[in-house]
Every structure is written in C-alpha cells, then in structure tokens.
C-alpha cells in the first residue's frame, strides 16, 4: 500500500535517554526511506493535549533519512506517548507500532516511556541459568537431608544416588533429596561462565520440608539442608565476584503446613499470625489450588505485609541487603497472590512490594511467574518482567509442533503432537506479545522454553528434532529481554514426560554422557549474547515464509539476524531497511549469506537455522 519504508522504536538507537526522569529532555528519531515534505512528532504534554513538533533531518543512516527532535517528557510515573506524522506528495501518513497508516494510531499502538521508571538495567544484557538447587551439584557432603530424617505428606525422606532417576510423586512425595546445595553452585562458577552466564535463577531455598521448597517453613532462614544462611552469603559473594547476579524464587502466596506462622496461628486464634491465613469454620485452612500442603496467605492482614515486605528487616528486604545482597526476586504464582473470594488484592500487593523493594535497592529485578499475557502487570508499577511463556516458550513449542499446554492434558506434561505453527503465525504471535508490553519493559522479559514446571522439550521424542530445536533456542537467545537456560538442557540431560518430576533429574556431570554438539551450540549463543550493544538494540520479528521466521536485532553500527528454519533447502530474502550491512558473517549454521542493496539473500540446507552478524 505504501511505497516508502519507515522505522522507529523505543530502543537505544531511536530514544535517548531510554530511561529519562520526569522533566528531562528526550531525543526521539525515525528513519524513512524517502525524504518527506515534513515530519512531525506528535507527543503528550502536561496540558493533557497532544502537541506536534517538526523534526529535523539529520542525514543518511544505513541508506535511510534520519529525522530527530528533542522534547521534554511529562509527569513522573505516567506514560508519555508519541507517534509520527509526515507528508509525501501532499498525502499525510502516520507511523506507530502499527506501522504506516493513513489513520491516527490508537493509544495502545503509540510509542511510550514512563518517566522516572526505576529499572534493573543489567537484565537486558544478561543471560540467565535456572537451577533447581537440590538437583544441581553437591559441594558440601556434611550438609543435606538424612535418610528417614522425617516424614512429610505421607512420605519419608530418602537420599537416592546422584545417578538414580527421580521417582514419581506418589512414591517420593517430594521427599527424595539428592542433596545438591549452595556450595555446589559456587563450585561450578567456571562452568557457568563457559556458557556466557551472567545471572542465575534459583528455585526456592528457604527452610522447607519438600525438595521443591515452595512449602516454606521459615522465610527468615535458608534451608540447613542447602547449607543455611552462611552458604547463601558465601555463594552470592562468589557469584558476584565472577560477574553473575542472583535471582531467588519466593512464594509470598503461601507457606508450608509446618510454617512457624501457621503453628502459632493454630495454637492461638487470637494471635497476630491467625490473621495471616484463611481459616474455615471447622478450623482447617484454605490452601492454594487446594494443594493441602500449601496454605494460602491473607494479604488483608497489614501485619503480614509488614513481616513480608514493609519492615526494614522484612523477609524480602533482608535478603536484598548484606550479607546476602541478592539482585532479584522471582515471584511465584504472582497473578494469584492476594486473591480469594472478596479479597482481590493482587495488584495492590505487588505495587507495594515494588515500592518497598526499590526503597532498599534501586536496580532490583522483580520477575513474575505468569503463563498468560502479562500486559496488565507491565506498566512500570508492578513487575519488571515475567517468565515469558506467553511471548516465547509457548510460541516456540508450537513452532516445533507441540500442542499448547493449556490445550493438552496434564498441563503439557503429557505432551501432544499438533500441526506446527507457520512462520507467519510465530511472527504474529511474538509481535503481538511484544507490542502489548510497556515499551521499556520489553527488555526485562525472561525468555525461555524449558523450566522446572514444563517437560524438557528435548525429552519429547514425538516432536523433538535437533535442527528445529536449535533454531528455536537461537530465537530465544536473540529476542529482546534475558534468555533463561534451564540447567542441563545444554548437555541434553535425561528426563521423562508426564510430571514435574520428569523435568527435575539430577544434573549430569559425567562428560561422557554430555551432548557435546548441543553444549557447543549453547556456548556459541552465550558468546553472541555478550555483545555489549545487544541489550537495548532495536528488534524486528519477520515472517519469511510458511516454514521460516527471523529475529533481527540491530543498532546503527551492528546487527544480528537469526533466521529460523524448519523447511527444505532453499534461498530466502530479508529486507534490511534500517540495518547496517556493509559486512556479513555467519556466526552459527551452514549456508551462505550476502547482501544485494538493502536485501539479505540467504541459502541454507534443510531445517538449518543460521545466525548472521552484520556491521559497518
């Protein structure tokens, strides 16, 4: 419909500064393939009206005309939005996240900033490694669970050999401790660095009865079976000295049955702790999702909020401060917190958590667990990012031919085959997910395919194809945000379908059992992610054809193109508008890539995905 091309985005190349304070002047730019008669930035003002300001031509950039203008951003904490208008041959156009249109873009499609947004800027340039602590590595044989030490939920503590397969829940009752510990994580710091890891996400480590530790007994202390409080302080110190941040998992939604708070509540119905829970008339307690070992916490209690996140010595503040000094909280079942019956306090709780955490650490990262579209929580006042199942994991699994977990039995653990998504569907789904999130928060999403709550994709033999899987992983590494690698995926760790237990096998440390090809691939992706320019680079998700899509990341000087393919041997073309393309190099994959004008011509083998680097 339109002969010209245009591109702008909330990224380091088009908005400066990217995280302004209220009242600060921001330079905003756009690239156009032709020289219009006039280009105008239409932007919010503190009058409540949209003003227009003519943009100045700055010269040519990668074959396009660059126009820029500086404007003051408005009220602290409120969205500052804008779009562009221009005239070619007497005909007006508009440009927004919707692309080029003849109509004025709606508010939801306008570009936006949140002035004064306090953000964890380190996230966008990080690569994360998720660790299930009991199953990663044993570093201190003097700590850990003992065989038959106690009984819990109908089971008794067992200590299998490291090479034993985990039993199903009905046999183990989540009491099978392999005795991985925090020192074991410290001991593997060089291994983590070899993967390009700069952040680790640990599943819960608080004092608990079960191996998954979501049934917290005491939030104020680290489980002695993992080494206790000193082990956390020591581990964080070691990781920080090696450039690795630490994300801890916390479920403020519920405790365990043996929680110190619940014990006091049951002993004395007049106690403060009694108000922390939802007690029924028969004296029993309401539990999250009716899981009898996970009694739900009640956030209409002001004192509970004080203990959990308000007080200087509250749980969530304590571990952000020395001697622990963690960097982030992963927020378990976060859309469900504060919700039961007439209590609908979820957003209120998280807004207060954010305010309180930022009072002690300005760059703390708050990442929610949400399997759906998180747009309502991603407006700068609740979470920084989410475990991005919606915009990465669920889409990439569908691309590889696995039915979406919410359409399959056992929440996806008994995975089912389905017709693969096309390149058009993948690109459409990813773009919709990205456009729904507040523009600055795009860079704080935690992108993933596998986790402790999903079957490991490479263990699903009905759909797994090594070459197609590599392409999906490549896309995960290149999407804006932080890629998250689940421990052991890089070496093809064993596992099974059907339950969470099948995704929580002990880490394989015997190198003769490693998938060296997959390990080499992950190391190559980790190395690519370390490019300093990549964190806040612009992005495009492009449909190539039915069996290919592309993730493009770029600045005015550097670019990566991840061409993800599950089709036959062929040649394809990609539009390189706004990208630097003087020099071209294939970083990973087999094929040929060359530029002709502002097009990239790529030839590749069947099911071969390619990562291409370009620069000027």
Task: Give short role names for the model-derived ranges.
Residues 132-198, 205-324, 349, 353-359, ...:
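Substrate-binding/active-site clefts of carbohydrate-active enzymes
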Residues 1-129, 198:
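Glycan-association/targeting regions that enable binding to alpha-glucans and other polysaccharides
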Residues 36-46, 80-82, 569-590:
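Beta-strand-rich binding/interaction modules
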Residues 30, 131, 192, 202, ...:
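Conserved, mostly hydrophobic/aromatic
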Residues 121-123, 262-264, 268, 316, ...:
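Conserved alpha/beta catalytic core and glycan-binding cleft of carbohydrate-active enzymes
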Residues 542-579, 610:
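Carbohydrate-binding surface patches
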Residues 34, 596-616:
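C-terminal beta-strand-rich structural cap/linker in extracellular carbohydrate-active enzymes
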Residues 503-543:
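Aromatic- and carboxylate-lined catalytic core of secreted/periplasmic carbohydrate-active enzymes
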């Amino acid at each position: 419909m339109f002969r010209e091309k245009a591109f702008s985005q909330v990224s380091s190349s088009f908005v400066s500064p990217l995280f302004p304070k209220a009242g600060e002047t921001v330079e905003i730019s756009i690239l156009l393939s032709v020289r219009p008669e006039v280009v105008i930035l239409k932007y919010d003002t503190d009058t409540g009206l949209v003003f227009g300001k003519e943009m100045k031509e700055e010269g040519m950039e990668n074959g396009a005309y660059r126009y820029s203008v500086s404007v003051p951003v408005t009220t602290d904490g409120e969205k500052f939005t804008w779009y562009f208008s221009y005239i070619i041959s007497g005909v007006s156009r508009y440009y927004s996240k919707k692309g080029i249109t003849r109509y004025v873009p709606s508010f939801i499609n306008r570009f936006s900033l949140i002035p004064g947004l306090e953000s964890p800027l380190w996230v966008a340039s990080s690569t994360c490694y998720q660790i299930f602590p009991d199953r990663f590595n044993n570093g201190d044989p003097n700590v850990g669970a003992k065989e038959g030490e106690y009984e819990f939920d109908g089971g008794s503590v067992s200590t299998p050999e490291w090479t034993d397969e985990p039993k199903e829940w009905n046999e183990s009752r989540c009491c099978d401790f392999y005795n991985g510990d925090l020192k074991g994580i410290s001991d593997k710091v060089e291994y983590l660095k070899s993967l390009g890891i700069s952040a680790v996400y640990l599943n819960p480590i608080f004092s608990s009865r079960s191996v998954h530790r979501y049934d917290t007994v005491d939030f104020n202390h680290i489980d002695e079976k993992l080494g206790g409080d000193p082990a956390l302080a020591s581990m964080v110190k070691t990781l920080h000295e090696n450039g690795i941040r630490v994300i801890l998992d916390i479920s403020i939604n519920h405790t365990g049955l043996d929680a110190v708070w619940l014990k006091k509540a049951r002993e004395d119905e007049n106690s403060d702790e009694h108000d922390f829970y939802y007690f029924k008339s028969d004296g029993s307690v309401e539990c999250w999702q009716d899981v009898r070992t996970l009694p739900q916490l009640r956030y209409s209690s002001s004192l509970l909020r004080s203990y959990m996140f308000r007080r200087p010595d509250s749980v969530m503040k304590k571990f952000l401060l020395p001697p622990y000094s963690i960097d982030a909280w992963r927020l378990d079942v976060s859309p469900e917190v504060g919700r039961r019956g007439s209590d609908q306090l979820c957003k209120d709780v998280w807004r207060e958590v954010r305010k309180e955490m930022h009072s002690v650490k300005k760059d703390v990262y708050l990442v929610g667990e949400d399997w759906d579209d998180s747009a309502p929580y991603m407006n700068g006042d609740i979470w920084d990012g989410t475990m991005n199942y919606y915009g990465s994991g669920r889409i990439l699994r569908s691309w590889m031919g696995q039915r979406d977990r919410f359409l399959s039995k056992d929440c996806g653990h008994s995975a089912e085959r389905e017709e693969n998504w096309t390149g058009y569907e993948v690109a459409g789904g990813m773009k919709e997910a990205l456009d729904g999130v507040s523009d600055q928060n795009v860079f704080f999403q935690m992108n993933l395919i596998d986790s402790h709550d999903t079957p490991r994709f490479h263990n699903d033999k009905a759909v797994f194809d090594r070459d197609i899987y590599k392409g999906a992983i490549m896309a995960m590494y290149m999407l804006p945000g932080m890629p998250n690698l689940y421990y052991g995926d890089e070496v093809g760790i064993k596992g099974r379908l059907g339950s969470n237990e099948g995704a929580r096998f002990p880490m394989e440390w015997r190198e003769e059992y490693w998938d060296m090809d997959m390990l080499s691939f992950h190391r190559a992706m980790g190395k690519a992610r370390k490019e300093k320019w990549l964190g806040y680079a612009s992005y495009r998700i492009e449909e190539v054809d039915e069996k290919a899509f592309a993730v493009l990341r770029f600045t005015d000087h550097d670019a990566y193109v991840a061409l993800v393919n599950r089709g036959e041997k062929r040649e394809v073309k990609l539009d390189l508008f706004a990208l630097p393309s003087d020099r071209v190099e294939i970083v990973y994959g087999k094929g040929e890539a060359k530029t002709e004008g502002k097009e990239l011509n790529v030839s590749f083998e069947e099911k071969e995905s390619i990562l291409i680097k370009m620069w000027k």
